Amino acid sequence: MSDKYQQRRFDIYGYEKIDTEVLEAIPYEYPEKNTVVEYITEEFSSVCPWTGLPDTAKLTIRYIPHQKLVELKSLKYYLTSYRNVGILQEHAVNRILDDLVKLLEPKFMEVIGEFHERGGISTKVVARYEK
């Protein structure tokens, strides 16, 4: 009996589909404070780079802003651009951290991806930046 799933793949896009251009920063009026800002979404998704099967996660972005905040609609569009990108879970979390640090230059940032179980294993990835 042949494995009818062996040759099946879904469309998988490369990293070039990650839309960093949509990200916008807005001025932060309290740079002298160490206020912690936290954004949480249960809707993050990307795909396995080998099979195209979806990887879904709860994503938490926590940071201490310096001069800038991320504009939330732009963040939503940016995160949605990962939807059909073939990227490892560990790489997705680090890429998000790198892109947001470049945009915002925060005092501190942490991105946590809690990926839902696949093959009996769930994955939690924590990436941090400190100035």
From Swiss-Prot:
| One GO MF term attached to the UniProt entry | preQ1 synthase activity
Q: Catalyses which reaction?
A: 7-aminomethyl-7-carbaguanine + 2 NADP(+) = 7-cyano-7-deazaguanine + 2 NADPH + 3 H(+)
Q: Name one GO cellular component term.
A: cytoplasm
EC assignment: 1.7.1.13
Q: EC top class, in one word?
A: oxidoreductase
- Alphabetized UniProt keyword annotations: Cytoplasm, NADP, Oxidoreductase, Queuosine biosynthesis
Q: Which InterPro entries match?
A: GTP-CH-I_C/QueF, NADPH_dep_7-cyano-7-deazaG_red, QueF, QueF_type1
Residues noted as binding substrate in the record, renumbered to the chain? V70, E71, L72, Q89, E90
- Tell me which Gene3D superfamilies the record gives: 3.30.1130.10
Q: Which domain of life is it from?
A: Bacteria
Where is the catalytic site? C48, D55
Subcellular localization: Cytoplasm
Q: Which family does it belong to?
A: Belongs to the GTP cyclohydrolase I family. QueF type 1 subfamily.
Q: What does this protein do?
A: Catalyzes the NADPH-dependent reduction of 7-cyano-7-deazaguanine (preQ0) to 7-aminomethyl-7-deazaguanine (preQ1).
Mind telling me what this protein is named? NADPH-dependent 7-cyano-7-deazaguanine reductase
> Native species of this protein?
Caldicellulosiruptor bescii (strain ATCC BAA-1888 / DSM 6725 / KCTC 15123 / Z-1320) (Anaerocellum thermophilum)
